[in-house]
Amino acid sequence: MTKHGKRIRSILKSYDFSKSYSLQEAIDILKQCPTVRFDQTVDVSIKLGIDPKKSDQQIRGSVSLPNGTGKTLRILVFAAGEKAKEALDAGADFVGSDDLVEKIKGGWVDFDVAVATPDMMREVGKLGKVLGPRNLMPTPKAGTVTTDVVKAIAELRKGKIEFKADRAGVCNAGVGKLSFDGQLLKENIEALCSALIKAKPPAAKGQYLVSFTVSSTMGPGISVDTRELMAS
């Protein structure tokens, strides 16, 4: 049997596919799975009881994970003049205005998150077909369209992430690294759940957190009991 096959078999023995676990149990299972040679990202996939086709049931926002993401972000800032200088001084990786717009039009997207000052959005808006599908478009709801670029950069460095329900009503997000202490991962996930619950549209009826799965990059998807998450 190959090393890969042994790893998969070991994972399959570690939990019951048909069962929903508490959040702590799910994290413990992931951390007990055979390791790989890199620090895996822990992801969550949350099916929401919304109709994303309706404008009053679309969900998008941001949340600051209390323990960060463990990821070093490449931050781009669309700004000019004094705001561009502030962004550079605050540690942004890429700062520019029309020059960056043209570069991105040419296909360059080698960054993880974009921030823009309001006066830049007229030009940045033209990049919708490039940035939109990659969830890189700055938005006021996510706090990435702002005059306070210094604050935005600091929050992103500390672990602020954006969440958004896709066309199927599913929200996917990275919530830390598998090397994190289990309690730190739990706190990050609870912070995301709290933000999602606060963002529940008034028009959404019935069960809101329909299903919840936590996984690692190379690990299994573990089903989590949504009743615990709604109560936390």
Swiss-Prot record:
Keywords on record: Repressor, Ribonucleoprotein, Ribosomal protein, RNA-binding, rRNA-binding, Translation regulation, tRNA-binding
Superkingdom of origin organism: Bacteria
Pfam families in the cross-refs: Ribosomal_L1
UniProt GO molecular function: rRNA binding; structural constituent of ribosome; tRNA binding
BP terms from Gene Ontology: regulation of translation; translation
Disulfide linkage: none
GO-annotated cellular components: large ribosomal subunit
Keyword Repressor: yes
Keyword check for RNA-binding: yes
InterPro entries: Ribosom_uL1_bac-type, Ribosomal_uL1, Ribosomal_uL1-like, Ribosomal_uL1/biogenesis, Ribosomal_uL1_3-a/b-sand, Ribosomal_uL1_CS
Family indicated by similarity: Belongs to the universal ribosomal protein uL1 family.
NCBIfam families per record: rplA_bact
Function: Binds directly to 23S rRNA. The L1 stalk is quite mobile in the ribosome, and is involved in E site tRNA release. Protein L1 is also a translational repressor protein, it controls the translation of the L11 operon by binding to its mRNA.
Subunit structure: Part of the 50S ribosomal subunit.
Name of the protein in question: Large ribosomal subunit protein uL1
Species name: Chlamydia felis (strain Fe/C-56)
Gene: rplA
